[in-house]
């Protein structure tokens, strides 16, 4: 692997199994393709949405762009008649403007893998909110959820309420000892 920092060129051979720390974001995982440096202007990640996993409705001041590399998932987007689910398949590109409510869910039997391009600020949020992946996936504890929610609030993210999520077909998970 060749890698430099600053304004120099970077080559990171993620596809060849170069060790990159994966972070668990309460189910989905991300791996940084670019350095997770808040001083940069953008961030590139490899995101994995496991089968059966849903990222509930949320919004933030950072645009996100997704190129679906493998698999398929549904993305909740603002359409002409309100929020609607769109299927995103391998090769599809999805743009989510800043401040737009959105969600993701994988109803397929296979993981959905995306190349995600967003702001360095959102990358910094992922760095702070994520738990290092060290083994098989573990369900989040109530403390993990509370920590994630507090960080989202600190970063100015808006998390959909259970009623807002239910209105678009998302059932919010119940965690032992809390909501």
What residues fall within each predicted segment?
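A short, N-terminal "cap"/entry segment at the start of jelly-roll beta-barrel domains
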Residues: 1-42, 135-139, 145-179
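Conserved short histidine dyad/triad with adjacent acidic residue
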Residues: 13-16, 28-30, 45-60
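Short acidic-glycine-tyrosine-enriched beta hairpin
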Residues: 13-14, 38-39, 65-67, 79-98
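Short histidine-centered beta-strand/loop micro-motifs
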Residues: 33-36, 54-60, 77, 85-86, ...
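Short, conserved beta-strand element in jelly-roll/cupin
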Residues: 44-50, 59-79, 117-119
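Ligand-binding loop in jelly-roll beta-barrel domains
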Residues: 90, 98-124
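A hydrophobic, small-residue-rich beta->alpha segment in the mid-to-C-terminal subdomain
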Residues: 124-139
């Amino acid at each position: 692997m060749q890698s430099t920092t600053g304004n120099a060129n970077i080559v990171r051979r993620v596809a060849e199994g170069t060790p990159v720390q994966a972070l668990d974001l309460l189910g989905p995982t991300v791996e940084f393709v670019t350095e997770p440096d808040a001083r940069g202007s953008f961030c590139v990640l490899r995101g994995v949405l496991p089968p059966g996993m849903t990222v509930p409705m949320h919004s933030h001041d950072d645009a996100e762009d997704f190129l679906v590399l493998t698999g398929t998932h549904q993305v909740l987007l603002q359409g002409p008649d309100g929020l609607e689910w769109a299927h995103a398949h391998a090769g599809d590109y999805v743009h989510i403007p800043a401040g737009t409510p959105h969600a993701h869910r994988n109803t397929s039997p296979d993981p959905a893998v995306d190349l995600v391009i967003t702001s360095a600020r959102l990358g910094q949020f992922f760095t702070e909110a994520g738990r290092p992946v060290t083994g098989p996936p573990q369900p989040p504890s109530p403390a993990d959820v509370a920590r994630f929610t507090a960080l989202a609030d600190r970063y100015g993210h808006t998390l959909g309420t259970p009623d807002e999520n239910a209105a678009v077909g998302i059932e919010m998970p119940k965690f032992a000892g809390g909501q």
